[in-house]
Amino acid sequence: MTLSFITRWRDELPATYTALSPTPLNNARLIWHNTELANTLSIPSSLFKNGAGVWGGETLLPGMSPLAQVYSGHQFGVWAGQLGDGRGILLGEQLLADGTTMDWHLKGAGLTPYSRMGDGRAVLRSTIRESLASEAMHYLGIPTTRALSIVTSDSPVYRETVEPGAMLMRVAPSHLRFGHFEHFYYRREPEKVRQLADFAIRHYWSYLEDDEDKYRLWFSDVVARTASLIAQWQTVGFAHGVMNTDNMSLLGLTLDYGPFGFLDDYEPGFICNHSDHQGRYSFDNQPAVALWNLHRLAQTLSPFVAVDALNEALDSYQQVLLTHYGQRMRQKLGFMTEQKEDNALLNELFSLMARERSDYTRTFRMLSLTEQHSAASPLRDEFIDRAAFDDWFARYRGRLQQDEVSDSERQQLMQSVNPALVLRNWLAQRAIEAAEKGDMTELHRLHEALRNPFSDRDDDYVSRPPDWGKRLEVSCSS
């Protein structure tokens, strides 16, 4: 089957990119590819059998027209000016059979005009982390970019140490970022901001294109998508680590996996990025940061969208966030209805977990085994203050009884939303260290496990992290 690529971005937004081709690595070789995703995208298996090929930037497929995008942004709350694809190249936009499109974005593809002081490369460590994280999030049901392939090489890349150069093929319906809009707003080119908005609406919100109120309705949906995404992050204990405006997806996708982390111990102020000295991007601050970023996007639209309309959309953010968060947390607790005491019960559990440094994922998974008429629970042994747990657990079981739902039905619901497996940093690190020694077994094994996060397991993937694996802070270097 021949893949079809189109050039909408190149044709319709000429001010937003520089055309250039990838720079191949030395002795590049394909070490992993996503068979399930490749099948979804109707990619012939033969493309994965001919060396690095397109996956290593050595060849282009017919119809591809590679380019590096320019954008700007606020980083850690400070205007950073022009940024852009410093090591990534958009190879093309695949046209799928249903009429939708999928960007093919090659990360680590070499120098671009937007590399600034960088070398245009990515390292094996970071490409493995992004591949694992994006696929983990996908199978958790959270909107995200996807990973299609990883190529490693003999090219040395200099970070804190010398690491092997690598490339990741990332795919997504769009790589539109808040930073694209900021770039032209701060260059005082509002007509180009409007062109970006029109492009987004035409291709991703086409049902609004003929509406005279399209910009307000579109921005309201961007706000809602962002609020929903952040709510989902919070419910699974995901910390992004670097929520700069240039890392914010217009479509509400999780984008740019760098120093991310999933909670081990429940620590609301968890900081996964060792460069985040002020804790701006701490776990509990993510909802506020996302709203701040939306305000920056709204500012770029103010030349052609009424400020009152923008503010109305921004004002809806918190309610959308709380609605999505509340719905999912009630499911995680096994509540079939909404009762006034639900928030208090959840907050009391969080307080107890924070005091005891309880494991976030394991706590909710074990809670899924609760029998409403039995005071016995395997979760009890996870707490030192048994009296405090017993008091909370008795009230929790009383709340479950109000719903008049069988244990089996409720447990099934809870186990479908409380994962047994999340991508803990130590699991990723173990796969990385093996891969850097040439052994890809653990990389493939972990990828396969992450496809079924809600299935029961009895291996170390679902155990508490070892001492060395706790509080692994990660840098932005990739």
Curated annotation (Swiss-Prot):
Active site (UniProt): 246
Binding site for ATP: 84, 86-87, 107, 119-120, 170, 177, 256
Coiled coil: none
Catalytic activity: L-seryl-[protein] + ATP = 3-O-(5'-adenylyl)-L-seryl-[protein] + diphosphate; L-threonyl-[protein] + ATP = 3-O-(5'-adenylyl)-L-threonyl-[protein] + diphosphate; L-tyrosyl-[protein] + ATP = O-(5'-adenylyl)-L-tyrosyl-[protein] + diphosphate; L-histidyl-[protein] + UTP = N(tele)-(5'-uridylyl)-L-histidyl-[protein] + diphosphate
Domain of life: Bacteria
Cofactor(s) it depends on: Mg(2+); Mn(2+)
Membrane keyword on record: no
Keyword Manganese recorded: yes
Keywords of the record: ATP-binding, Magnesium, Manganese, Metal-binding, Nucleotide-binding, Nucleotidyltransferase, Transferase
Gene Ontology terms for molecular function: AMPylase activity; ATP binding; magnesium ion binding
The EC number(s) this enzyme carries: 2.7.7.-, 2.7.7.108
Residues annotated for Mg(2+) binding in this entry: 247, 256
PANTHER family for the chain: PROTEIN ADENYLYLTRANSFERASE SELO, MITOCHONDRIAL
Protein role: Nucleotidyltransferase involved in the post-translational modification of proteins. It can catalyze the addition of adenosine monophosphate (AMP) or uridine monophosphate (UMP) to a protein, resulting in modifications known as AMPylation and UMPylation.
Similarity comment: Belongs to the SELO family.
Name under which the protein is recorded: Protein nucleotidyltransferase YdiU
Origin species: Escherichia coli O139:H28 (strain E24377A / ETEC)
